[in-house]
Amino acid sequence: MPIPLHEVRERTFAGTRRRIFQLLVDMGTSNDVIWPFAAQPFMRSPGPLIPGKTEEWHNGFHAVLEEVAPEERIVWRIQNEGFEGTHGFYLSGDAKKTTVEHRIDATLSDTEGRLLWRRLEDANERSMEALFDKIARVLKR
């Protein structure tokens, strides 16, 4: 039986949506200053973010960009076997504070999806917390 997965992590930062959105856009490129684990790289295809074309790879996940709305959200369609859904960054806030929410909304298949999530769940939690910590440090510069 398929299992729904809804994971949300968020943090509020002292920074503008414009600045934080650009940091997220640069993740996985040569301009990346926020991905926290050099030994576990975040990679994405070169060039601008283009829905349906831009791909990303990290922590065992492969995804294709589904939607990008400047200063609001970046949403990726997960391509892994057993995962049907998305993960993305959603930004909200005012001129001085921005909340970044990372969401995974997916349906896991009985076997492949559950096993993959069990293997990646801890890495996802550590990565998101470390990513948020790194964003906070970069914004203080």
Task: Map each language-model feature to its residues.
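Beta-strand/loop substructures that line and gate deep hydrophobic ligand-binding cavities in soluble
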Residues: 79-130
